[in-house]
A protein has these predicted regions:
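Alpha-helical scaffold segments in carbohydrate-active enzymes
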Residues: 2-10, 92-110, 125-135
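Inter-helical turn/loop segments and adjacent helix faces that build the functional surface
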Residues: 14-15, 74-92, 106-121, 139-150
């Protein structure tokens, strides 16, 4: 929430006028909300038919790891933004997201290389969630404009490093990376 607040405050300052952090966060039309689908999925493993499930810590860990690996790279790249305020937010956010990455990676390894059950559940969660990461690399017009202005990052330039982080953790966790392909 702290990272989002800093970004909303920056945008409100840049827009000026009656625009406030709260207006940006809470008073937008539905189509103005943006988020990766991965982050909106329930915190349980894959289901089929009318099955129901309780929350699954492994699913939460897999999701946090995949997203934190991206955000660590993104904040690191944004430290070089031409917008000094955004660069400062990135520097502060990078410290926090590195902690999240370390925490989720450690737990991913514990669960993946743990008991047969924790391994199987972690692999099932990875198989279920991984295809949604393809959305990370879908280029948007807003991203292109930010890159052109020198304030943003082309996320596709981060993919090789993200792949390396993910592959190293999965190898240590004895988990298999799902086949390429996704839902984008």
């Amino acid at each position: 929430i702290g990272q989002a607040r800093m970004l909303y405050q920056l945008v409100a300052t840049l827009k000026g006028g009656a625009v406030t952090e709260d207006k940006l966060a809470y008073f937008r039309d539905t189509h103005e909300f943006r988020n990766y689908t991965l982050l909106e999925l329930p915190h349980h493993g894959p289901l089929s038919g009318y099955a129901s499930s309780s929350l699954d810590y492994g699913t939460t860990i897999v999701r946090n790891f995949l997203y934190s690996a991206l955000m660590a790279l993104l904040w690191e790249a944004l430290e070089k933004s031409a917008n000094a305020d955004l660069a400062a937010i990135a520097a502060k956010s990078l410290k926090e997201v590195r902690y999240h990455l370390r925490h989720s990676r450690d737990w991913l390894v514990r669960l993946g290389d743990g008991t047969d059950e924790s391994h199987a559940r972690s692999q099932a969660s990875l198989d279920h969630l991984f295809p949604y990461t393809q959305e990370f690399w879908a280029h948007s017009p807003a991203e292109a404009a930010a890159v052109e202005a020198g304030i943003g990052v082309d996320l596709n330039t981060l993919k090789a490093d993200w792949d390396a982080i993910v592959d190293a953790a999965l190898a240590e966790a004895t988990l298999q990376r799902p086949a390429a392909g996704g839902y984008v």
